[in-house]
Amino acid sequence: MSKVVVLNDKLEKAGELDLPSKYAEVNPHNLYLYVKSYLASLRANTAHTKGRSDVSGGGKKPWRQKGRGGARAGSTRTNVWVGGAVAFGPTNERNYFQKVNKKQKRLALERALADKAAKGALFTADSLAIESGKTKDANAVIKKLGVKDALIVKDLLDEKTLLAYRNLANCYVVDVTEVNAYLVSVFNAVIIEKSALESITKEG
């Protein structure tokens, strides 16, 4: 069974909690599909080439059809001409959206949490608030745990905690309503407030 490491006020291990057993039984393909959809939604649709109807010029036939010994040509803007159109090139009309059902999103999150717990990289504490709002205090939390990077999940994200973590390159803080399977998967460790963890497991 997947275990969540419980931390005390000093961020030391104080015990373990069990994740629901069904989390580890979720097909990992659900996680793959969600991450694929999430990354596709981040793609910037900027690559664009001009087709025959987009390029300027080329309305006049460059030379007569017959009698001069060369290949026939009807326009100087076909894809075989320098300065002409591009055949089958990318356009900015493409839609990269990939639909993922609400249930599948939920299953993906459950699997991601189970994978983190199996690696001993899922932690929970009563409070993760940084009341001082200082980055050095937030950095001390990460150093204390000895992890390379971490996702911090708050039940209710306050401004001071956001300011404290915002300037850390190896840390990202989110409200529990914004957590998703991709964020859980991409960080080496996940630290969730106990009340936030309860709301996540309750939904499932």
From Swiss-Prot:
The keyword Endoplasmic reticulum is assigned to this record: no
A single GO molecular function term of this UniProt record: structural constituent of ribosome
GO cellular component, one term: ribonucleoprotein complex
Keyword Membrane in annotation: no
Chain segments carrying region Disordered: 49-75
Keywords recorded for this protein, A-Z: Ribonucleoprotein, Ribosomal protein, RNA-binding, rRNA-binding
GO biological process, one term: translation
HAMAP family noted in UniProt: Ribosomal_uL4_B
PANTHER family assigned to the protein according to its UniProt record, in alphabetical order: 50S RIBOSOMAL PROTEIN L4, LARGE RIBOSOMAL SUBUNIT PROTEIN UL4M
Subunit details: Part of the 50S ribosomal subunit.
Function, as annotated: One of the primary rRNA binding proteins, this protein initially binds near the 5'-end of the 23S rRNA. It is important during the early stages of 50S assembly. It makes multiple contacts with different domains of the 23S rRNA in the assembled 50S subunit and ribosome. Forms part of the polypeptide exit tunnel.
Sequence similarity: Belongs to the universal ribosomal protein uL4 family.
NCBIfam families the record matches: rplD_bact
The protein's name: Large ribosomal subunit protein uL4
Gene coding for it: rplD
